[in-house]
Amino acid sequence: GYSLDSIKDLLEKASDKDTLIIPILNVYGTGPRIQRLVPGVTVLDGCIYIVGFVSGRGEITQMGKIFRLVYGAHRSTIVSRETLEAVQRDLQESGIKAEISDDINRDTFVKWSFISAMAVTGAYYDVPMGEVQKPGKVRDTFIGLSQESAALGRKLDIEFKEDIVEYNLKVIDQ
């Protein structure tokens, strides 16, 4: 996992009471964890959708046109709608599709669910994402892991907009 504690000093040094932090790590619950590290700073939560690959040493290449940031205030953070919309405008002016979430806890869990199922399936079978699109044991594993995430989400009282397994399959089949 990520060592969030290691960034505390940097965040304290680089921010003040007017700073707004939007973590976009593929980790569920990042915003609240960072908020506890730097209580004097406003920390939201977020997730990013982008497709890319390591194309060289210290280099990442974006593939396709998917580049979307979903963000919002987690339960213990109060941020004005005006501030959230100002961030959205800045991101959109930079060419990033930005969405303000009405339930960032749900939306970051959904992203985590997809990434987790894909990463474990890919690592276990040593296959790229395209193999999950084909019927068989690789896809069945991805479905099983997505079902486990759905069960965990229900235990966490997360209300999904749609069935998380169907959603994950829709994403993988695009």
Identify the residue ranges that each predicted region occupies.
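Rossmann-like NAD(P)(H) cofactor-binding subdomain of soluble oxidoreductases
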Residues: 1-59
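Internal alpha-helical scaffold of NAD(P)-dependent oxidoreductase catalytic cores
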Residues: 13-14, 37-42, 57-162
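Short, solvent-exposed loop/turn elements at beta->coil junctions and helix N-caps
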Residues: 50, 103-106, 170
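Short, intrinsically disordered, charge-balanced linker/junction segments flanking boundaries
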Residues: 166-174
